[in-house]
């Protein structure tokens, strides 16, 4: 038996998120269908991040155990890509220890959020950028982001309810203008709550337009109340860019 970790890129536009759901097209479901065709048996998988509907990935990591000992990582990569649809692609595969779990072994997760800051929309980019036609001040956004760095209770930035702790650690936020009209917000952390990154982006963009003062970020964080936060940024601008492990380079 071999355990593999696949580094996967996907266009999330036509998926109902990562996690398997009944009668829905999901990344995990489609990936497991490809594995079943290769193995002639159901093969369970374990992902590093549960991206929401419409969210993309460049560095999702999906682990699984195979009884096809003859297959090298390269052979497995080729077999998977031959059986996957054209909106998912395996970039590389690593052989990992039998107890490896990408969800729990991850040391850091890096998300990128892309914003098209133009007066007119670009229809060819509409699935991958949040079109934001208003002027924004990136320095104000950077000031606000500093309040979010470190370990905090991010209840105000959570959508929905679950049993997980709301204490999370953000290790870095970078706000860059890649080109004249493209803004990148890069958020790094150990793990995130549901829609946490999109909620952070929504707040930062409101700060950038002058709708909220940067120092108000601290009050919103400490309020532990989702209703204090502006609307979440849309899903289609978000990319799970990279997951970092000790075991291998992604």
Swiss-Prot record:
Gene3D superfamilies: Pseudouridine synthase I, catalytic domain, C-terminal subdomain, Pseudouridine synthase I, catalytic domain, N-terminal subdomain. It comes from the Bacteria. This is tRNA pseudouridine synthase A. One of its GO terms (molecular function) is RNA binding. It is an enzyme of class 5 (isomerase). The active site is at residue 52. The keyword tRNA processing applies. It comes from Kosmotoga olearia (strain ATCC BAA-1733 / DSM 21960 / TBF 19.5.1).
């Amino acid at each position: 038996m071999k355990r593999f970790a696949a580094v996967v890129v996907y266009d999330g536009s036509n998926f109902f998120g990562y996690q398997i759901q009944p009668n829905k097209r999901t990344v995990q479901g489609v990936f497991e269908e490809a594995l079943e065709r290769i193995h002639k048996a159901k093969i369970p998988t374990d992902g590093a991040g549960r991206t929401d509907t419409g969210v993309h990935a460049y560095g999702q990591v999906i682990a699984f155990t195979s009884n096809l000992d003859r297959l090298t990582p390269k052979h497995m990569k080729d077999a998977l890509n031959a059986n996957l649809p054209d909106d998912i692609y395996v970039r590389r595969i690593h052989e990992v220890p039998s107890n490896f779990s990408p969800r729990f072994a991850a040391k850091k997760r890096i998300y990128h959020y892309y914003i098209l800051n133009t007066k007119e929309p670009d229809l060819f980019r509409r699935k991958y950028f949040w079109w934001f036609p208003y002027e924004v001040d990136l320095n104000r956004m950077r000031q606000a982001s500093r309040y979010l760095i470190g370990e905090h209770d991010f209840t105000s930035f959570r959508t929905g309810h679950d049993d997980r702790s709301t204490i999370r650690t953000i290790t870095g936020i970078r706000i860059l203008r890649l080109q004249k009209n493209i803004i990148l917000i890069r958020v790094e952390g150990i793990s995130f709550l549901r829609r946490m990154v999109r909620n952070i982006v929504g707040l930062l963009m409101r700060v950038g337009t002058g709708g909220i003062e940067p120092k108000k970020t601290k009050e919103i964080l400490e309020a532990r109340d989702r209703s204090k936060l502006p609307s979440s940024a849309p899903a289609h601008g978000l990319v799970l860019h990279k997951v970092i492990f000790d075991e291998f380079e992604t």
